[in-house]
UniProtKB/Swiss-Prot annotation:
Belongs to the RRM NCBP2 family. Residues 30-108 form the RRM domain. It holds the Pfam family RRM_1. This is Nuclear cap-binding protein subunit 2. Component of the cap-binding complex (CBC), which binds co-transcriptionally to the 5' cap of pre-mRNAs and is involved in various processes such as pre-mRNA splicing and RNA-mediated gene silencing (RNAi). The CBC complex is involved in miRNA-mediated RNA interference via its interaction with Ars2 and is required for primary microRNAs (miRNAs) processing. Also involved in innate immunity via the short interfering RNAs (siRNAs) processing machinery by restricting the viral RNA production. It comes from Drosophila yakuba (Fruit fly). PANTHER family: 20 KD NUCLEAR CAP BINDING PROTEIN, NUCLEAR CAP-BINDING PROTEIN SUBUNIT 2. The lineage of its organism: Eukaryota, Metazoa, Ecdysozoa, Arthropoda, Hexapoda. GO terms for molecular function: RNA cap binding. It is found in: Nucleus. The keyword Transmembrane helix does not apply.
Length: 154
């Protein structure tokens, strides 16, 4: 196995099962986590890019759990492992919508995982960001809440 398809050190803290079960699931998986997407990247764009590596079974867009709008990640599942490995090799670190995307192994999509886990509904990493990132909704959500004018006139 080449270095580009090896497992990263990241592990989903919400995985239901032991560490060894998670490792086994990752090693056998045909599912990829895709991160650092623009909030404006479409499922069609993702399909066009990832289908160059093989037959994509399904794409599940990551959504803000409250607004149900894209929040910068998705899951891409292939029918066979070798095609997912090709995507790890050739798509990880490429540009999509002028952003370097990250591709990592995922133990397999489970309903509910398409929603952001942050307090405000999106991804945790976007809550604490202090820089302005137009492709990911501007400033970090917690910072935006602090600097937003108070519109509550009670």
């Amino acid at each position: 196995m080449s270095a580009s398809v090896e497992l990263s050190s990241y592990r989903d803290q919400h995985f239901k099962g032991s560490r060894s079960e998670q490792e086994r699931s990752l090693r056998d998986s045909c599912t990829l986590y895709v991160g650092n997407l623009s909030f404006y990247t479409t499922e069609e764009q993702i399909h066009e890019l990832f289908s160059r590596c093989g037959d994509v079974r399904v794409i599940v867009m990551g959504l803000d759990k409250y607004k149900k709008t894209p929040c910068g990640f998705c899951f891409v599942e292939y029918y066979i492992r070798s095609e997912a490995e090709a995507a790890m090799r050739f798509v990880n670190g490429t540009r999509l919508d002028d952003r370097l995307i990250r591709v990592d192994w995922d133990a397999g999509f489970i309903e509910g995982r398409q929603y952001g886990r942050g307090k405000t509904g999106g991804q945790v990493r976007d809550e604490y960001r202090t820089d302005y990132d137009a492709g990911r909704g501007g400033y970090g959500k917690l910072l935006s809440q602090k600097i937003a004018p108070n519109t509550d006139n009670r």
